[in-house]
């Protein structure tokens, strides 16, 4: 807010009547001053309230800040412009005033003045006639010449200043330095200005030369340079120069404009430290704190204003009034208004507008309306800010009829609504379904110069908020609709909103009507629309948009097609996805990394691992494509599922060399997939590296490593790893099954039994897999009593036998030559409903061979074919072995030759 200077009589505060009474003696500032510090800029009036009230304040006398700084040796030139700029909003339009008052000169026609006039020449611009000037020229004459040049020519002023230096005219000459600092400030030659100020340090009474610093600070405030102005102020304090009112006023005005609270607090504290009273500084500090909602700090400043016996001026009253209104403390705000008028100030439209806005903020519109009607009774007429505040207030109160009434009155009086009013109205019209009103409001928006893109954003926001986005096509009529069809930005905003809310038909309709031409932008827009559908799960809509795109433009776009492949994959339409990929491939479009990732995942989800591998081979041929961490993990999983151990090993070392960042998921994936492809030392090193970097292996990783170490008979590592897994709390049934199997294969029955007990102790039931391991271990070691005991325990438990159990029994009984037991197991297997599988048949053929039942063994092969179970190499190998065991060499040779011919 501007800075006004009024002489205010101060009287004590009457607490019963809630009025502030002040006497002429500032020492009578009341102790019971009932004001809590509140701060704010005058937002209540939407920033236009100050300018709208100038007609009320035309007759108020404004004292320049320069009168407070009459110590200034240069006619307070550095101070007056600051005060004028700060008070212009309240004192009326001063645009006709020249910027630099100090440039106006009037020489009396005495002998000295005539002598000065003879020293100037005019060669396009005023300069000094150095041939006529004498080194003995008086200091007063030199300063007069410099002053004249400063107002006319910066270059010539600097030139003459250098002449004065050469002729010893600058020692102790603060006036000359101040004048040249004005020039340097305008030219922003700050380094030279700093050098000159440092020169002044050695002069006598330099500590009193505040005008030197005021000059450069003023130049900074004119340019809005907060950082540099603060630098000069800090330097001023470091050199021991005491600031004056003008210094503080300029700085606080600059800090208020830029909402720089830290520097404002610094300047304000030093103002009080030096005992300077600058009324506008208090207002600025209150304004900054209020704007930043630091209300407690604002209260402290108001208390300081009382302690410092500040004579309140209009701006002080207004910022306090606004501070209370911003907080909704309207009783205190009204008491401020009463006291302000009692102090001799005329009714002020700014004050009333502030109160109206304050009541609107707390939804007390009856009180706001009462103030509005009171304006005429006190000789004030509502201005545009009054109407605007009423519109906003009724809008907050959700009263469309009243807001609409004041909006119409605003227009009837010849005022224009601001963007806030229009935003309020369009929101109410969207909520209450006034389509015709919305169309008129949109016309008003365009009438006041609002940009179409901004209007569209407001409309979409308003109708989205009330869930009526489907109404938007009905209110976008005429020129607005034409603009949307012609303007790419507005067009894209609207179709994106339509797609977001499932209005794909409206989107397609608008796409058919577009009038702009930009193929690159259009492709990008289609891609965004399709991606938006994908993210919101509207996959069918994405297909519609894609089909529309292909109808109007058959050119294949890599990004759009890749996204559609991904969408078809999610929909499970793998044939459509593959068709798009093949189109890309045949068109010669080269896939990028993302495209390859999408196609690979498509084939993986479709179960076509071989096709996925072929795509990866094509990708490897393109040396410029470097997979990211996600694609690397996909490749690892694919090669693992395809059991491509060589590729896994090669890929592992490729990942190591790629320089990508390994996270926890990458370590787990590499260990899980490459466990059987890597040397044991490399695998162990990767695991130790993972632990060293603070990553936690998951359960699968621990189980895979337990299996690898167990098969390698590294039981010490198995125990260490198992304990580590328990420490991390990731041990599961599979972990126990794995170590039980490892001990079983190594015939370590003691540790195997101990693992079974620990499994039960940890709350796990003995699993079917564990029972199968025990049966296999004891059976192969021909401990048949143990075998039968385990079998009985398993049948009593909840774990019923599976194919693997029956196959173990057939194998063990067959190895013993117990054909009757084998027959019983086969019968039980068939009665269980499971029936023999490939492994069962292979085991039976082996058992029949041992038992001398060759014909039955050959019959099993025929039975397999009859049940559509395709014999494998193990089947035929077991059959040939059975025939040889039973001296059927000729038949064995026939089967061997047949296997060779079939490539088995």
Curated annotation (Swiss-Prot):
Transit peptide extent?
1-61
Note the SS bond partners. Answer: none
Annotated region (Disordered), positions in chain: 75-94
Q: Which InterPro entries match?
A: Pentatricopeptide_rpt, TPR-like_helical_dom_sf
Q: Where are the transmembrane segments?
A: none
What start and end residues bound the annotated signal peptide?
none
What Gene Ontology molecular function terms does this protein carry?
DNA binding; mRNA binding
Compartmental location: Plastid, Chloroplast
Write out the ranges of the repeats annotated as PPR.
173-203, 209-243, 244-274, 278-312, 313-347, 348-382, 383-417, 418-452, 487-521, 522-553, 557-591, 592-622, 628-662, 663-697, 698-732, 733-766, 767-801, 802-836, 837-871, 872-904
One Gene Ontology cellular component = chloroplast stroma
Q: Which UniProt keywords apply?
A: Chloroplast, Plastid, Repeat, Transit peptide
Q: Which stretches are annotated as coiled coil?
A: none
Query: What family does this chain come from, according to its entry?
Result: Belongs to the PPR family. P subfamily.
The protein's matches in NCBIfam families, at most eight in alphabetical order, are given as: PPR
Pfam families (alphabetical): PPR, PPR_2, PPR_3
> What is the protein name stated in its UniProt record?
Pentatricopeptide repeat-containing protein At4g30825, chloroplastic
């Amino acid at each position: 807010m501007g800075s006004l200077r009024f002489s205010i009589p101060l009287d004590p505060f009457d607490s019963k009547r809630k009025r502030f009474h002040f006497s002429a003696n500032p020492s009578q500032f009341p102790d019971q001053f009932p004001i809590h510090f509140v701060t704010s800029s005058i937002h209540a009036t939407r920033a236009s309230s100050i300018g709208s009230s100038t007609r009320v304040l035309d007759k108020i006398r404004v004292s320049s800040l320069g009168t407070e700084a009459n110590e200034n040796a240069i006619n307070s030139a550095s101070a007056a412009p600051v005060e004028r700029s700060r008070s212009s909003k309240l004192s009326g339009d001063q645009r006709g005033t020249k910027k630099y008052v100090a440039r106006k000169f009037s020489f009396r026609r005495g002998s000295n003045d005539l002598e000065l006039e003879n020293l100037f020449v005019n060669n396009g611009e005023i300069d000094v006639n150095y041939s006529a000037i004498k080194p003995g020229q008086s200091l007063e004459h030199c300063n007069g010449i410099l002053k004249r040049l400063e107002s006319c020519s910066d270059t010539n002023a600097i030139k003459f200043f250098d002449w004065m230096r050469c002729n010893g005219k600058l020692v102790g000459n603060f006036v000359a330095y101040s004048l040249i600092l004005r020039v340097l400030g305008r030219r922003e030659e700050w380094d030279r200005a700093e050098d000159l100020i440092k020169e002044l340090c050695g002069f006598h009474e330099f500590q009193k030369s505040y005008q030197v610093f005021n000059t450069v600070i003023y130049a900074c405030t004119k340019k809005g340079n907060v950082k540099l102005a603060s630098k000069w102020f800090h330097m001023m304090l470091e050199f021991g120069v005491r600031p004056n009112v003008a210094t503080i006023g300029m700085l606080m005005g600059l800090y208020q404009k830029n909402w720089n609270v830290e520097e404002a607090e610094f300047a304000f504290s030093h103002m009080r430290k030096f005992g300077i009273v600058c009324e506008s500084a208090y207002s600025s500090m209150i304004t900054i704190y209020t704007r930043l909602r630091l209300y407690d700090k604002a209260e402290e400043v108001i208390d300081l204003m009382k302690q410092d016996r500040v004579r309140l001026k209009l701006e002080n009253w207004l910022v306090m009034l606004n501070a209370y209104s911003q907080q909704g403390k309207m009783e205190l705000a009204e008491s401020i208004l009463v006291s302000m008028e009692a102090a001799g100030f005329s009714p002020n439209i700014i004050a009333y507008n502030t109160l109206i806005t304050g009541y609107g903020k707390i939804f007390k519109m009856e009180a706001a309306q009462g103030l509005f009607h009171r304006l005429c009774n006190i000789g004030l007429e509502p201005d545009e800010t009054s109407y605007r505040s009423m519109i906003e207030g009724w809008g907050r109160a959700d009263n469309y009829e009243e807001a609409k009434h004041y909006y119409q009155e605003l227009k009837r009086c010849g005022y224009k609504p601001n963007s806030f009013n229009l935003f309020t109205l369009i929101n109410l019209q969207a909520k209450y379904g006034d389509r015709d009103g919305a169309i008129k409001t949109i016309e008003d928006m365009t009438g006041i110069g609002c940009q179409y893109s901004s209007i569209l954003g407001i409309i979409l926001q308003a109708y989205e908020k009330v869930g009526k986005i489907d109404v938007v096509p009905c209110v976008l009529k005429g020129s607005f609709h034409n603009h949307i069809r012609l303007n790419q930005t507005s067009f894209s905003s609207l179709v994106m909103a339509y797609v977001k809310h499932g209005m794909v038909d409206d989107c397609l309709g608008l796409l058919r009507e577009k009038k702009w031409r930009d193929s690159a932008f259009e492709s990008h827009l289609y891609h965004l629309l399709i991606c938006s559908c994908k993210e919101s799960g509207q996959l069918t809509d994405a297909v519609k948009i894609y089909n529309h795109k292909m109808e109007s433009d058959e050119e294949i776009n890599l990004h759009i097609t890749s996204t559609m492949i991904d969408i078809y994959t999610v929909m499970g339409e793998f044939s459509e996805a593959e068709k798009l990929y093949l189109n890309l491939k045949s068109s010669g479009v080269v896939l990028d990394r993302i495209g390859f990732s999408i196609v690979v995942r498509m084939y993986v989800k479709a179960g076509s691992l071989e096709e996925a591998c072929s795509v990866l081979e094509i990708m490897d041929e393109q040396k410029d494509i470097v997979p990211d961490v996600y694609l690397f993990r996909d490749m690892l999983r694919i090669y693992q599922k395809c059991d491509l151990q060589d590729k896994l090993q090669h890929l592992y070392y490729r990942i190591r060399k790629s320089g990508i960042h390994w996270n926890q998921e990458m370590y787990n994936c590499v260990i899980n997939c490459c466990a059987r492809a890597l040397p044991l030392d490399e695998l162990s090193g990767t695991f130790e590296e993972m632990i060293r970097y603070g990553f936690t292996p998951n359960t699968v990783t621990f189980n895979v490593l337990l299996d690898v170490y167990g098969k390698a008979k590294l039981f010490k590592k198995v125990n260490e790893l198992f304990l580590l897994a328990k420490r991390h709390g990731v041990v599961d049934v599979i972990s126990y099954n794995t170590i039980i199997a490892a001990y079983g294969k190594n015939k370590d029955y003691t540790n195997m039994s101990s693992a079974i007990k620990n499994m039960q102790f940890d709350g796990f039931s003995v699993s079917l897999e564990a029972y199968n391991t025990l049966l296999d271990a004891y059976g192969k070691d021909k401990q048949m009593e143990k075998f039968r005991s385990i079998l009985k325990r398993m049948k009593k438990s909840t774990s019923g036998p599976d194919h693997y159990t029956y196959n173990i029994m057939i194998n063990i009984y067959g190895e013993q030559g117990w054909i009757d037991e084998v027959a019983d197991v086969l019968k039980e297997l068939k009665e269980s409903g499971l029936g023999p599988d490939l492994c069962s048949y292979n085991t039976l053929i082996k058992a029949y061979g041992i038992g001398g039942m060759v014909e039955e063994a050959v019959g099993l092969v025929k039975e397999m074919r009859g049940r559509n179970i395709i014999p494998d190499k193990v089947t035929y190998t077991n059959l040939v072995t059975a025939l040889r065991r039973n001296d059927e060499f000729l038949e064995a040779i026939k089967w061997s030759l047949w296997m060779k011919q079939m490539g088995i």
